[in-house]
Amino acid sequence: MPRTILTFEEMEDEFKAIKRLGPFENILLVTGENPAKAGVPYLAQALDIAKKYFANLKIEVMPLKSEGYKELTHHGLNGVICFQETYNSERYKIYHPRGMKSKFDWRVDAPDRMGQAGVHSIGMGVLIGLEDWRTDVTFLARHLRYLQRTYWRTKYSVNFPRMRPAENDGFQPNVLMTDKELAQLTFAMRIFDHD
């Protein structure tokens, strides 16, 4: 499926169509890592349109500077989701050898910049399947605890998307997580963090 960047008119049409489907009040706006086409000015205008239709506005976009997140909060931004993918900095280079996404520290520090900007809700997670999930989730839990202590007014959520083998000899995860292991992880995180 080819990627596309919606015009603001197309975006408004999509928001109206979603509202016709039911009383939805939450929306997640997602972009690729392309600041030239979908940077802070584009996101600010998108949020201005979205807030006419939805009460809770979240984004899942490339990591931004703290000032960018701060500006977007003035346009109605409530939350940001940013997956670290893996906390293994050496293996991260293999998955993202070049381009903006290749900057491990820039990505791992993104939740700090969100907290500094006063973002109300921060979603984070690792991609289960890239590396040993127990190790990655341990680092995720430590990162979460640090953020909770540093930006204590912010709400947090954690996500555990499991990667699966792609058809036709496509991407193959390094580790497959079973349903039992997902349950184990969920229970462990509930014990670790009651929120």
Q: Where do the model's predicted regions map?
A:
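Short, small-residue-enriched loops and turns at beta-alpha junctions
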Residues: E33-A38, I128-W133, V175
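Core AdoMet radical
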Residues: P2-E10, L21-V40, I49-M114, H120-M124, ...
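Charged helix-capping and loop-helix junction motifs
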Residues: E10, P41-Q45, T138-R142, T178
